[in-house]
Amino acid sequence: MIPYANSPLSVPAQSARTLLVVSGAITLALYLLPFGGFLARPFVLLSTLVHELGHGLTSLLLGGGFRRLQMWSDGAGVADLDTTGFGRLRGALTLAGGLVGPAVAAALFFTLGRTAPGARACLLGLGVLLLLCEVLVVRNLFGWAFTGLVAAACLLTALRGTPAASQLAVVFVAVQLALSVFSRADYLFTRVASNPNGRFPSDVEVMAQLLWLPYWFWGLVCGAFSIAVLGWGVRIFWGR
């Protein structure tokens, strides 16, 4: 006999699972309401911001630079990086860092969102990171305004909100970033990307040029990695 095998869930686990259900219900409501797409638009923009930060932070981790970040209201974004001296592998990893960025961020948010203290630390860390980005790398008006608003919301919720509010915010954002992995998956299988500055080879197309195999192969690799990371994050969140 193993007494703990069928024991009730701990209070933190019950709370976390309830928050996940609530976040899912809110998300469903956003998609069902006539104006839900408008209300959900900020989360599309958030996935863009996380994508571009994924490129920039990966470049920094691999010894490169992060010069500038721009994003626009249509959901497009670009990160200007210094990859001088990067070989093919480091260049490809920097590109992949943006493609898997939303999934990695979602998994991290799920992990920290299991507890109220973890959620508060997550919001504080994200708020400070975004403020640093605001000063150091964001270089267009829309990007500056959006990044500043997200940073302010994170810090305000962490410092003034209740523990439950912080936890709900982190879990809700994790759900939105997780959904963006699937709702924006078409970008993993396109050769051309566009923004107000023009049309350019997509991330997977440049990866193909660096590593020879076709762009769709690298789209599959990044997609599979994203799903695996998400699964890991949800499993930890669910208490397994």
PLM regions: where:
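Metalloprotease/metallohydrolase-associated module, dominated by Zn2+-dependent proteases
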Residues: 2-29, 74-238
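N-terminal signal-anchor transmembrane alpha helix
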Residues: 10-56
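Small-residue-rich helix-interface/hinge motifs
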Residues: 36-91
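Residues in and immediately flanking transmembrane alpha helices
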Residues: 64-68, 111, 239
